[in-house]
Amino acid sequence: MKITILTIGKRHEPWVEPGIKRFLERLRAPFAAEMIIIPHSGQIGDRARQDESERLMSRLKPHDFIILLDERGRNLSSPELSRLILDHTDQHIVIIIGGAYGVTETLHRRADIVWSLSRLVFPHQL
């Protein structure tokens, strides 16, 4: 099984890189894992949301299991997240983190689950 973290953003601050590397190494023990950073669009508002969502969606395959991170999503406990992942080990799991302006409704509907880590919005480094 493969897990891809697909995010809009830029290269992380040097102090963040070791944490991301360690997290991906821990994921790689049971899974093939990667992080793909797609650059910000350079637009603002709705234009940025549309452009970035299109670029995110262009990376998706029809049978990918999509988890979209969004503050309006469901809160999951660790056992619930574990069960969700185990139930989809036969699929490529893609975790999407949108840009500052969020994602389009089209991408929202494409997600198999919308997951909220918190009702707060955090910088990508976290």
State where each predicted segment sits.
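Post-transcriptional modification and biogenesis factors for structured RNAs
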Residues: M1-L126
